[in-house]
Amino acid sequence: MFIVKAEIRDKKGKSFSRKLRIEDKFPGVLYGFNNTPISITMDHNLVFNLQKKEDFYKETLCLLIKEKKYTVKVHAIQRHAFKMKILHIDFIYAKI
């Protein structure tokens, strides 16, 4: 199982997302199963290297947010049109 570390993101919007990407981070969202969505940020290089593996999309992942573990699956990934960059990831809760 892959482990992805994330932090809760308080600010939202295009300008904040751009600032995150300058710091080699990117935004994401965790949602599903009647839970309130959690806005998160992740380290770009860590996730970029993990997503190169095919199992990243097939298996459930462990998302660590403030020492709390969430079992999730990748729902959608937005990538830059011509740069090797991830712009945003949507995760959904996974039932075990």
Curated annotation (Swiss-Prot):
Self-association state and partner proteins as the record states: Part of the 50S ribosomal subunit; part of the 5S rRNA/L5/L18/L25 subcomplex. Contacts the 5S rRNA. Binds to the 5S rRNA independently of L5 and L18.
Keywords (A to Z) from UniProt: Ribonucleoprotein, Ribosomal protein, RNA-binding, rRNA-binding
CC per GO annotation: cytosolic large ribosomal subunit
MF terms (GO), sorted A to Z: 5S rRNA binding; structural constituent of ribosome
UniProt entry tagged with the keyword NAD: no
The keyword Methyltransferase is assigned to this record: no
Pfam families attached to this UniProt entry: Ribosomal_L25p
SUPFAM superfamilies in alphabetical order: Ribosomal protein L25-like
Family indicated by similarity: Belongs to the bacterial ribosomal protein bL25 family.
PANTHER family: RIBOSOMAL PROTEIN L25/GLN-TRNA SYNTHETASE, ANTI-CODON-BINDING DOMAIN-CONTAINING PROTEIN (PTHR33284), RIBOSOMAL PROTEIN L25_GLN-TRNA SYNTHETASE, ANTI-CODON-BINDING DOMAIN-CONTAINING PROTEIN (PTHR33284:SF1)
Gene3D superfamilies linked to this entry: Ribosomal Protein L25, Chain P
Function: This is one of the proteins that binds to the 5S RNA in the ribosome where it forms part of the central protuberance.
Protein name per UniProt: Large ribosomal subunit protein bL25
A biological-process GO annotation: translation
Coiled-coil stretches: none
HAMAP family: Ribosomal_bL25
